[in-house]
């Protein structure tokens, strides 16, 4: 078997969404632990910035070192000035330099809310439902499993010529 491709995924999310993001990332880490093709490091500010470090500098370094973005889309994510000014431009718009995988974490209204450049991208949801719309642990685990499958396909496409 060929060596796994090692990738760092930058995970921008709103601080208030932390509990849901943690659950989803833990489930994804478990799925990717068994991947035949990829070894994934999920970079997120709450675990990768050490006490005493300058958070803006650390976030920008994590963003620069990342291969892709795993964007945790929610109303709070879209409302964040910091995400909008310092993180999203690397993934959408004229300054975009990195591929993205947008995930529907919490419901947003595609018609009524400003999606900050994400309106043209397929946002992952499970059968049209956002992650937090699923009530049982089993449904949330299934969301993570289906997201893992979609991510494997997207990562294979993005890294095909690398």
What are these model-derived regions, one by one?
Residues 71:
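Redox-cofactor binding/interface segments in oxidoreductases and associated redox assembly factors
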Residues 124-141:
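Short secondary-structure boundary motifs at beta->alpha junctions and helix caps
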Residues 75-96, 108:
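Conserved TIR/SEFIR loop-to-helix hotspot centered on a Trp-containing motif
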Residues 108-123:
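Glycine-rich, charge-decorated loop segments at or immediately adjacent to ligand/cofactor-binding or catalytic sites
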Residues 1-68, 91-98, 106, 138-162:
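Conserved N-terminal substructure of TIR/SEFIR domains
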Residues 18-19, 78-80, 133-134:
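A generic structural signal for short coil/turn motifs at secondary-structure boundaries
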Residues 21-23, 81-83, 113-114:
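A short acidic (Asp/Glu
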